Amino acid sequence: MATSIIARTGAEALIRDQLVNTIQQDVPKSSIVMQLATRLANMTSNQTKIPVLSMLPLAYWVNGDTGMKQTSKQEWKNVTMTAAELAVIIPIPEAVLADSSFDIMGEVQPRVREAMAAKIDGAILFGNDKPTEWTTDILTQATANKVTGPIDYAKILGDGGMFAKVEEGGFGVDGVVGSLSTKAQLRGLLDKNGRPLFRSDMQGATNYALDGAPLYFPENGAFDVSKALMIAGNFKKIVYSIRQDVTVKILDQGVIQDPSTKEIMYNLAQQDMVALRVIMRMGWALPNPSTRLNTDGSKVPFSYIVAGE
């Protein structure tokens, strides 16, 4: 007796694969520095000079009725902020755009912005791939305020800890930026009485803050744990300005060369390709004006902790 059936292998040509109409992906991450720093008015040229108070006047007691009054002065200096360009070109064959079920250009642009945010944070905080036009990064400027771990109550909030280093310069800490991997260490952090510093119970979400200063854990991939585990400081003292906001242009003519060898890689017109070009220009500075607790402006409003030896 025949027992034949139409099996899956025999009907495979008639079975369509389902394509989910949404792409599974994380939300693009922004720049933590641009979130916390102070934005100035847009730059009108590639350089902006910021007047900064560099010397404070003094006052003196006068001895007796006919004592001589002393003189004093006040001075200012210019801090130069130079715009650097951040850009990328992404070539795409026109046939790929036509055949795709998704808006490739629309998918790429947010990821380019995310990549730019990571580059900005890495250059300003750690000096990673820093453009030559920019000033020294935050960690290099704060070398004298470095604290060697491990992460514990004393190294963060105690005498000689991160917060103390910033406060010794006459600054208050308004934020702490840390690697996402430091959360595990913070969850186990105890105060001097042996109580959890952050968690009051095991059910509720943990709100991370230190002495009133919120903690941030950027997820754009820019935080360099090989150079620091956490950075504390007065982030509002960082100023930045945009010379050219993110500008997107679709190129369909011209050639694209290898930046190293100058060899032509793509000829857009000849190969029926387009290229997404994204550009932005910005500058930043840490003016650090003189104060009564930082009269010569030599103290930096940042400190950071590194892993112990």
PLM features: what roles do these ranges have?
Residues 44, 141, 145-274, 280, ...:
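Extended oligomerization regions of viral-like shell subunits
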Residues 2-32, 37-40, 266-309:
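Protruding loop/beta-arch "assembly-hinge" segments enriched in small, turn-prone residues
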Residues 54-59, 87, 96, 118, ...:
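Short loop/turn segments at secondary-structure transitions that flank enzyme active sites
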Residues 100, 185-188, 286:
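Extracytoplasmic/secreted cell-surface and envelope-processing proteins
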Residues 18, 45, 103, 107-111, ...:
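Generic recognition of stable, solvent-exposed alpha-helical segments in well-folded globular domains
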Residues 2-88, 152:
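Assembly/oligomerization interface modules of large self-assembling protein complexes
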Residues 70, 77-80, 85-168, 298-299, ...:
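Alpha-helical scaffold segments that mediate packing/assembly in large oligomeric complexes
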